UniProtKB/Swiss-Prot annotation:
Pfam families in the record: DUF1328
Species the sequence originates in: Ralstonia nicotianae (strain ATCC BAA-1114 / GMI1000) (Ralstonia solanacearum)
NCBIfam families: PRK13682.1-1, PRK13682.1-4
UniProt key word Cell membrane: yes
Membrane topology: Multi-pass membrane protein
Name this protein carries in UniProt: UPF0391 membrane protein RSp1666
Localization per record: Cell membrane
Keyword Transmembrane on entry: yes
UniProt keyword list: Cell membrane, Membrane, Plasmid, Transmembrane, Transmembrane helix
């Protein structure tokens, strides 16, 4: 589960690069939305991995 958390975090960083860096100005809005989605998925996956690891 922590592997998925890291993958989501990396995807979120890439989305932030495109969204906040001005590289893809036309798709900045979409990239910002994707960034937030993947950050949420990262946090959920991280939490899930920590909780599942204790069981």
């Amino acid at each position: 589960m922590l592997r998925y958390a890291v993958i989501f975090f990396i995807i979120a960083l890439i989305a932030a690069l495109f969204g906040f860096g001005g590289i893809a100005a036309g798709a900045a809005g979409i990239a910002k939305i994707l960034f937030m989605i993947f950050v949420v998925l990262f946090v959920v996956s991280l939490f899930w991995g920590l909780v599942a690891g204790r069981g």
